[in-house]
């Protein structure tokens, strides 16, 4: 089974491609986490977990969900992580997670996809994003070949910098940067509730037709990037930046 968590669609796209290529079922962790569902999941022998990279590891909400949820029938697990640039030493923590789940760790693969973290970085324009997705195709095909053969992924880069970013920096990053207090709706907001619907942590609700954010945020960027009116800002950091979600690329390809 292919399990995935996504912020703005990159991981969903990769998970869908992997599930189709392996003829395996696809399991949406966003819906599961939003519903608070930790019932056992009948996965079968092989599990592929596809996630974005948050602070140089898999998202904390995903590792917490896995800690509470039995993967019935699972014996082996592969991790596929998409990122804007690097995953640090995420593989070391993925190995620990596999051991905790009593699963054979089959490795971690990194796939570069378009950046979406506009709370800190710039997202690409659509044409540039499309090019990044095209450049990811050879790595995705390599991942599919290894998965079909039941092979372990080769070890990713692991140096002192990687261990530092995934180690000491990760909890510090969550503590000081992963907060919702800078999100706000502008006058362009139409109160459609899209952000409420998309928030996997149920951290957004509408008051007087405008979104209000709570304190349980994972910085997935779904609310700000999927807003149909681009009416959400993250303080001053997101001003003037393009919004990115994968489905906009698919629509652009269909329009051509």
What does each model-identified segment do?
Residues 184-185, 190-212, 216-218, 222-239:
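Iron-sulfur cluster-binding cysteine motifs and their immediate structural context
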Residues 35-37, 116, 235, 244-245:
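Short secondary-structure boundary/hinge segments and terminal tails
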Residues 1-2, 6-14, 20-32, 39-51, ...:
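FMN-binding flavodoxin-like domain, especially the glycine-rich phosphate-binding loop
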Residues 230-256:
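Long, positively charged, glycine-interspersed low-complexity recognition regions
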Residues 50, 82, 128, 186-187, ...:
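Conserved short-loop catalytic and cofactor-binding motifs
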Residues 56, 113, 208, 234, ...:
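Generic structural "secondary-structure junction" signal
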Residues 159-191, 197:
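A mid-sequence, solvent-exposed acidic-amphipathic segment
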